[in-house]
């Protein structure tokens, strides 16, 4: 296999880095997007969920100011500081009191930290929460002077709020008040100054707090000013009188909506119950002066909403140095503004009190770097905060990538040096040491007499350099990440091959030089053979090619023979001087070649003769082909020969006897890899895939192959029985099924069935899993990595491990479309299950179904509620059987949650097309049909809604709120029916279409809408009559008609049993079968027996017509399915009007309902 490169594709490791830094510190934090409205929360960790008691699904997309944690003791000043911190680009800490979901209060230290992208702009905020103390331990609220008063939900009518702001810096400015006020007319407002404009009630003065403009809010008090005494006490003598607050222009409105010059929005001194909190800048120096004095500046005499006062405009646009110097001290004032403005006049600025938005104007460019203080606070180490972008793995300076070309060349060089060491180290230790002792000393001729010593010295130097390079070479950890940190590389190398490499690189001949013990040097030199371990650990890199495998096998055989030849010569050389009888193999060799040893032991064959003869003996012994010309004679030689024969037989049998088997075994996975890779490259070449896409394709294939090792799990599982397959799938998905809350409590059989349906998906960084507009056919569970969800270019959520995304399958009978793109930030592993498979399993285990849907919390709902899935082209996406099964399942699993979600249609009643904007004001419905006619297709009538059932519904009084004078829409009214009821037949409708009485409540045109987004009124749970265009009938008239219809239906129920009994009697006595209306067989004439049963029924039509006078009118207006043929306008009709006499009924066959294909 190729070199394991690890995860080298650019990844967005923002979430992983934050979690890794915080996981050991018990941090509680959320991440918010600074580029969306309200700085919505896009991620929260488990610690924050445990702290506040809310689940992750409840926190996502909420404002990061945590308004849902506010309570009676939450300080307004602290909340305003958090809001202002979100406007800037610097870190800030705020201490604030929050409330958990259970109502308990705690004091929390919030640390707001900005996060930048590659351009240096702040795109996100990290809010870290640290619990200081539980609020229950604090004293009574009377001592909490900075705590916020009760909100609207806890505040009794007429009770005002108290807001005291600690501004000690204002005390130092009192001495300069006159100078600043004198220059207020021509100066400019300080850039950092703000105005505090709040509703206050009189409170006890404090040495450190400043009561600002305390007034009482009254709903019917237009002026909004408190008593004159209070104003004089606050403003002081000499202050100019205030004019009506309605004359004060709103600079905030102009800054937010420059085009709305004609807006009538103005600042008000009082705060009504519908007003909202906002943040605004100071518009002039007068505002700053008034803030110091505790009042607002006097408004201009001629205020205009179309343009600002010239003086204000001049002050805003002034940038002179004198103005900045004049007000340099005002920047010390905390930048906090609470401006309660009555915005009811401008719908663009209107906001409900329950959802307080933070409107963040551009104060300054958010390009400040994260300070070192932030790094220390969050304990992020040297990495500071990661940037939110796709970035390649960070490589430290002077670090070598383990897959770089330089490293590859260096490894080949080291391999050659290792081979040299493996060959010459045993040779020099066995053959050359004796010659060195007999030759001249090295001190006289130096390295000129020993050329191999120079080479050995160079090899030792290269090995030492290789050790240094290994300290700077990256590696791949267990998480498939490339590690480039020098410290971690050193620790990894110390734990691995450092000891072996160090021992093999020690130059023992230099350390023991001059000691005279050449035998010891020769033995220590054999430690260099440990370098062969480097070759052994890299053999798998070259074992995928057949030629390389054969070459390595032959080299291994020759190297072992070389080592054995050196040992064979060492044995004979050791025994030769001490042997009296000349029987050793060296003596025999000398006698054979004519170079015998003399009596002193000198002479004999040359080194070349000795080595070649020894190598010849070992090869012949290893291959079991001994010719006997070189034979062992001494006991030592014979024992060694036995060992060589054993080794030879083992090598011969295992290598040469099974070369083909070894190659096939080594090539089994490699051959499949290259075959598949060849197919991929042929596909790329044939379709001319562009370069970037080609690289992504090859990179994914290589990583997927290394991830699965080329194993096709489906092919492997197919060879096992289903019970074993279920056990294997249960083991592979055990982490998800054991730790995911919705699967807890499921039986073993249910878990096995679910495990069989799950599929594992592996996604590289940058890969898009779901595109905007794609059908949501599966539910995804993240098991590793992190993903981001984008709407356009805006990140709306970041999901990590154990998060779930998709759509709530139990609320919709048909798959919806995605409202955003889902893109992987890192290498991700996801478990997905298709909606059909999940619904099928839950259908088999209905006792587990309710628990699953109630405990399933989808972290992010991808369903696009702004689109209408029930379009004509979407009918072909599902088969008839799956539609019926999904409709049945959706009915059985309906919950009351449908009525609580605006924009979703109730799943219990068949008529769920509410009077939304999409169905109102357009004649003819969504497909251009008239209100009183226009057929619709049977497919759309069956499964257009989230839940559709053919079973009759029990009728309940209609209580959905409707505008006055607006009748129920979707069905024509009675006078419309009278105008177009030429073909209406009450009798045939009563007999052959009793179900039409109930289908009146479920309009076919209403079922074309699966959901209505942003519906202002909740949808009824059981009965939802669609609303038509407004102004056609008053509400009282419609309700009276509904009551009359209810009474008629009650009468019908009393006669239904008798009528059905009569019909059954007619069918039983009919002797001949009546063919279908669309059949080619002619209907035989009625026999004489067919007229007698009809005589007793003569009074029945009259009674039925009387009892169904109004019902028939509604039935006549009901639309036919689009697949049914239209009724003929001329000629005989199948539905007889029967204007009072029943004689014709005896000669006419029974007719079918209008929905029958032949009617």
From Swiss-Prot:
Q: Outcome of residue 920 to Q?
A: In LQT2; uncertain significance
Documented effect of changing residue 631 to A: No effect on cell surface expression, but changes inactivation kinetics
Outcome reported for the amino acid change (mutating residue 58 to A): In LQT2; uncertain significance
Q: What is this protein called?
A: Voltage-gated inwardly rectifying potassium channel KCNH2
Effect seen on changing residue 609 to G = In LQT2; uncertain significance
Q: What is the effect of changing residue 242 to G?
A: In LQT2; uncertain significance
Name the species this protein comes from.
Answer: Homo sapiens
Q: What is the effect of changing residue 58 to G?
A: In LQT2; uncertain significance
So what does mutating residue 562 to R actually do?
A: In LQT2; uncertain significance
Per the record, the gene is KCNH2
Note the effect listed for residue 924 to E. Answer: In LQT2; uncertain significance
Outcome recorded upon mutating residue 114 to S: In LQT2; uncertain significance
| Ranges within the bilayer without spanning | 612-632
Per UniProt, which keywords does this protein have?
Cell membrane, Coiled coil, Deafness, Disease variant, Glycoprotein, Ion channel, Ion transport, Long QT syndrome, Membrane, Methylation, Phosphoprotein, Potassium, Potassium channel, Potassium transport, Short QT syndrome, Transmembrane, Transmembrane helix, Transport, Voltage-gated channel
Please list the residue ranges annotated as the PAC domain.
92-144
Question: What result follows from mutating residue 924 to A?
Answer: In LQT2; uncertain significance
Q: What does this protein's UniProt record list under function?
A: Pore-forming (alpha) subunit of voltage-gated inwardly rectifying potassium channel. Channel properties are modulated by cAMP and subunit assembly. Characterized by unusual gating kinetics by producing relatively small outward currents during membrane depolarization and large inward currents during subsequent repolarization which reflect a rapid inactivation during depolarization and quick recovery from inactivation but slow deactivation (closing) during repolarization.
What are the Low complexity biased-composition ranges?
A: 928-939
Q: Glycosylation: which residues?
A: 598
**Impact when changing residue 108 to R:** In LQT2; uncertain significance
């Amino acid at each position: 296999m190729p070199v394991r490169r690890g995860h080298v594709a650019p990844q967005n490791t923002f979430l992983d880095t934050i979690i890794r830094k915080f996981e050991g510190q018990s941090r509680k934090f959320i991440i918010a997007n600074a580029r969306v409205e309200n700085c919505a929360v896009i991620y929260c960790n488990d610690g924050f969920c445990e702290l506040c008691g809310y689940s992750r699904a409840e926190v996502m997309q909420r404002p990061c100011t945590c308004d849902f944690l506010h309570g009676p003791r939450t300080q307004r000043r602290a909340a305003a500081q958090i809001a202002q911190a979100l406007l800037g680009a610097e870190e800030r800490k705020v201490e604030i009191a929050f409330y958990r979901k259970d109502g308990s209060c705690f004091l929390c230290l919030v640390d707001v930290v900005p996060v930048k992208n590659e351009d240096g702009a702040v795109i996100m905020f990290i809010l870290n929460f640290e619990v200081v103390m539980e609020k229950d331990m604090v004293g009574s609220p009377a001592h909490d002077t900075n705590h916020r008063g009760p909100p609207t939900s806890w505040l009794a009518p007429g009770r005002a709020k108290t807001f005291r702001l600690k501004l000690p810096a204002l005390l130092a400015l009192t001495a300069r008040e006159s100078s600043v006020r004198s220059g207020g007319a021509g100066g400019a407002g300080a850039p950092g100054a703000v105005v505090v404009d709040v509703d206050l009630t009189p409170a006890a003065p404090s040495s450190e707090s400043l009561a600002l403009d305390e007034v009482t809010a009254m709903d019917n008090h237009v002026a909004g000013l408190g008593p004159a005494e209070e104003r004089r006490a606050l403003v002081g003598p000499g202050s100019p009188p205030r004019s009506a607050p309605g004359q004060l222009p709103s600079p905030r409105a102009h800054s937010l909506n420059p085009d709305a010059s004609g807006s009538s929005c103005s600042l008000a001194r009082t705060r009504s119950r519908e007003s909202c909190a906002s943040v605004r800048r100071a518009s002039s120096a007068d505002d700053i002066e008034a803030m110091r004095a505790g009042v607002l500046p006097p408004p201009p005499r001629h205020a205009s909403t179309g343009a600002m006062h010239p003086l204000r405009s001049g002050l805003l646009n002034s940038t002179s140095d004198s103005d900045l110097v004049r007000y340099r001290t005002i920047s010390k004032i905390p930048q906090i503004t609470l401006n309660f403005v009555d915005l009811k006049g401008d719908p663009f600025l209107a906001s409900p009190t329950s959802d307080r938005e933070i409107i963040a104007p551009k104060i300054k460019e958010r390009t400040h770097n994260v300070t070192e203080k932030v790094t220390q606070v969050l304990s992020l180490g040297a990495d500071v905060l990661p940037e939110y972008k796709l970035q390649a793995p960070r490589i430290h300076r002077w670090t070598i990538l383990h897959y770089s070309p330089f490293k590859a060349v260096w490894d080949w060089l080291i391999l050659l040096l290792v081979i040299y060491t493996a060959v010459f180290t045993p040779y020099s230790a066995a053959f050359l040491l004796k010659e060195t002792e007999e030759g001249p000393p090295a001190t006289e001729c130096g390295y000129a007499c020993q050329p191999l010593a120079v080479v050995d010295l160079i090899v030792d130097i290269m090995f030492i350099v290789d050790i240094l390079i290994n300290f700077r070479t990256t590696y791949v950890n267990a998480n498939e990440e490339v590690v480039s940190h020098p410290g971690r590389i050193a620790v990894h190398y110390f734990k691995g091959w450092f000891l072996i490499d160090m021992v093999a690189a020690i130059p023992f001949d230099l350390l023991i030089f001059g000691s005279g013990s050449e035998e010891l040097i020769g033995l220590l030199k054999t430690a260099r053979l440990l370098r062969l371990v480097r070759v052994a650990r890299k053999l798998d890199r070259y074992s995928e090619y057949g030629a390389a495998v054969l070459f390595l096998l032959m080299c291994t055989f020759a190297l072992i023979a070389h080592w054995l030849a050196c040992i064979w010569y060492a044995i004979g050389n050791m025994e030769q001087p001490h042997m009296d009888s000349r029987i050793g193999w060296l003596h025999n060799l000398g006698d054979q070649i004519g170079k015998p040893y003399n009596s002193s032991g000198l002479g004999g064959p040359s080194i070349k003769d000795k080595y070649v003869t020894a190598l010849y003996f070992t090869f012949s012994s290893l291959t079991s082909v001994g010719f006997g010309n070189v034979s062992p004679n001494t006991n030592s030689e014979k024992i060694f020969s036995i060992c060589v024969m054993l080794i030879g037989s083992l090598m011969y049998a295992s290598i040469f006897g099974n070369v083909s088997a070894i190659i096939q075994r080594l090539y089994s996975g490699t051959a499949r890899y290259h075959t598949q890779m060849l197919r991929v490259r042929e596909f790329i070449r044939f379709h001319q895939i562009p370069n970037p896409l080609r690289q992504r394709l090859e990179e994914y294939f290589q990583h997927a192959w290394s991830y699965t090792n080329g194993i096709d799990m489906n092919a492997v599982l197919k060879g096992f029985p289903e019970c074993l397959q279920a056990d294997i799938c249960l083991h592979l998905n055990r982490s998800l099924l054991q730790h995911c809350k919705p699967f807890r409590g499921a039986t073993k059989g249910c878990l096995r069935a679910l495990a069989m349906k799950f599929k594992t998906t592996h996604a590289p960084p940058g890969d898009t899993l779901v595109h905007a507009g794609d059908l949501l056919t599966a539910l995804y569970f993240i098991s590793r990595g992190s993903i981001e969800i984008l709407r356009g270019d805006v990140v709306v959520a970041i999901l990590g491990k154990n998060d779930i995304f998709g759509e709530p399958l139990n609320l919709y009978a048909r798959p919806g479309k995605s409202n955003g793109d889902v893109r992987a930030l890192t290498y991700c592993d996801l478990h997905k299950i298709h909606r059909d498979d999940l619904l099928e399993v839950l259908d088999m285990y209905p006792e587990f179904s309710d628990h699953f849907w109630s405990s399933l919390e989808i972290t992010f709902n991808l369903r696009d509620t702004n689109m209408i899935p029930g379009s004509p082209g979407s009918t072909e996406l599902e088969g008839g059987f799956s539609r019926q099964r999904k409709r049945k399942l959706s009915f059985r699993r309906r919950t009351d949650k449908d009525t609580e979600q605006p924009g979703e249609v109730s799943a219990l009643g068949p008529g769920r097309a509410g009077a939304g904007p999409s169905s109102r004001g357009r004649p003819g419905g969504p497909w251009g049909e008239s209100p009183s006619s226009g057929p619709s297709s049977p497919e759309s009538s069956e499964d257009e809604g989230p839940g559709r059932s053919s079973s009759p519904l029990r009728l309940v009084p209609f209580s959905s709120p409707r505008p006055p004078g607006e009748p129920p829409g979707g069905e024509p009214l009675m006078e419309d029916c009278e105008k177009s009821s030429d073909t209406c037949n009450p009798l045939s409708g009563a007999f052959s279409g009793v179900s039409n009485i109930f289908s009146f409540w479920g309009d076919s045109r209403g079922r074309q809408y699966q959901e209505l987004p942003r519906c202002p009124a909740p949808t009824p749970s059981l009965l939802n009559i669609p609303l038509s265009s407004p102004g056609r009938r008053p509400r009282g008239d419609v309700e009276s008609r509904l009551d009359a219809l209810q009474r008629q239906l009650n009468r019908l129920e009393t006669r239904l049993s008798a009528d059905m009994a009569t019909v059954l009697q007619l069918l039983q006595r009919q002797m001949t079968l009546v063919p279908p209306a669309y059949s080619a067989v002619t209907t035989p004439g009625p026999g004489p027996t067919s007229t007698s049963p009809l005589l007793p029924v003569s009074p029945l039509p009259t009674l039925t017509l009387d009892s169904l006078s109004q019902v028939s009118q509604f039935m006549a207006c009901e639309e036919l399915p689009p697949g049914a043929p239209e009724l003929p306008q001329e000629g005989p009709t199948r539905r007889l009007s029967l204007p009072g006499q029943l004689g014709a009924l005896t000669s006419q066959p029974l007719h079918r309902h209008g929905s029958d294909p032949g009617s």
